[in-house]
């Protein structure tokens, strides 16, 4: 059926200057012609998006439509046109919260309390609506306007997910390194508490101008986070009230089940009794540290942008860290056209590609385990990795579709388990296609090395495709297709 090209955005809105840019999108100021009201239009080039990216875009729009709160950047319209999708948001003109703080003449604990209160109000609304943001960080905390006392607005729901109640599940490895929670780093089921951990990191920075977890080496940074290894060093923390430290401790609790919730945090004395509990003393040292923290965030962001534009990836740090200032170290950037080169240049880069790489590696690993079970003649181990309804096309079945594992039992009991000679298998050029969150397909060439009856080394080759499905957190092979040599080495 022929579809007419929608031009509703072009008809209803007038576009103006560029406000920002992403990999597949640009943000521009726009005006609704009928009302004269100004907005920010996120313009996504859908021609360049994969099916998975399309799903993410739909999810982001669906989530943003749900959220209507004074401390959240609101989505007003979502329009698809030929090759382009428009998301029309509030136009927020106050810039980043952290940039505004360093321009203030006066900044105290009480101000930090007011900032985190607004962030917590936004997080509470998200959680009440069944949304987990997953990427709370300074870059996503904006101010509604340049006016004094302008509202803090939570932005960028590109990584946000929908959850049912207090559901905990593995939703993928996503976020920004210094703000990731221990449960995400441990690849454990997670949910709303990940946002509260990030709030703890943000509050820590709001009070002293540097983050609780930092290391030049990303692996060591992750070890620190998993161990909850942060402290309140002198002299800067000596002037912070015990109540502020108590709230940070409750947010940076390793066990997510014991971590404070947004609703509980809003009832904490340091928040709800601010005027009598939070210190009013001006924190000049915090402002100075925060200036350096902001400068490095911007510099590293610029370096990353340049690297992405020029494809010049380097793992060396181009500048040294100023003494006495801590910062989180960044993410791995993968450039498919440039091999697996890595960069540790940006503190503020969101990771999701790392999750995709990890999931693909998981599929390769489970395929290797399955083949190891075949080579060792371990039928019980084989059936644990295979779905009971496994279907297959294989040379042994002479072109017939086989269902279940009983057909394979014969080979395990009469040939594979009887062989005492070593068998070695190599998977060449494995290609993994991820199909949503819980399904994947892997294609590869399988080389099997073995000793024949005359003790002569032999090699067999087969071409295989396996389809995997994850049930209850466990990958199972549901179908495979093999051509070429059979599984059992020929004599």
UniProtKB/Swiss-Prot annotation:
Expression across tissues: First detected at the 18-somite stage where expression is restricted to somite boundaries. At 24 hpf, expression is elevated in epidermal tissue and in the hatching gland. After 24 hpf, expression dimishes, but persists at low levels along the dorsal trunk. At 48 hpf, expression is restricted at a low level to the forebrain. At 72 hpf, weak expression reappears along the entire dorsal trunk in discrete cell bodies.
Domain Protein kinase: 13-271
Catalytic reaction equation(s): L-seryl-[protein] + ATP = O-phospho-L-seryl-[protein] + ADP + H(+); L-threonyl-[protein] + ATP = O-phospho-L-threonyl-[protein] + ADP + H(+)
Mechanisms controlling activity: Autophosphorylation of CAMK2 plays an important role in the regulation of the kinase activity.
Top-level taxonomic group: Eukaryota
InterPro entries, per the entry: Ca/CaM-dep_prot_kinase-assoc, Kinase-like_dom_sf, NTF2-like_dom_sf, Prot_kinase_dom, Protein_kinase_ATP_BS, Ser/Thr_kinase_AS
Phosphothreonine found at: 286, 350
Region feature (Disordered): 315-354
Positions of ATP binding: 19-27, 42
Function per UniProt: CaM-kinase II (CAMK2) is a prominent kinase in the central nervous system.
Subunit text: CAMK2 is composed of four different chains: alpha, beta, gamma, and delta. The different isoforms assemble into homo- or heteromultimeric holoenzymes composed of 8 to 12 subunits.
Family: Belongs to the protein kinase superfamily. CAMK Ser/Thr protein kinase family. CaMK subfamily.
Protein name, as recorded: Calcium/calmodulin-dependent protein kinase type II delta 1 chain
